[in-house]
């Protein structure tokens, strides 16, 4: 079996990839507009993400997490797809797996599904309310070692100490998309 050796000039160094990883955005997407999509687009360009996956959660999951949602799942997905229509589909996608399940899906189950489906490394973006809930889950310690968490300081929710203890795995983003300190 041929090995496929290639000749390269002395001192050749392979260029690092121009884009890296997948950004998984966990949100309700209920009150989103072009502004929020623009913010995500700017973050994706700045950090050079290869793929951005928007993951709206079913109302059963949101109810169990204690996160209010007035709109049904299918309306939020339709709104999100409408907002993303002008962006390149090969880079920006909406994953509707949770809508097919039509029931409560734990965050770690969703993360397991998404990490099996998309390329690594993984960056998970959540607002501060989601992140505070996620830090209280049993599987948080396992997942924070596998993903890097981008916490969007959107609602001013105080973050638990367990989350802040993993400061090297967290990045904080202000309301306008700028990097902020805790």
Stretch-by-stretch model annotation:
Residues 1-182:
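Nucleotidyltransferase catalytic core that binds NTPs
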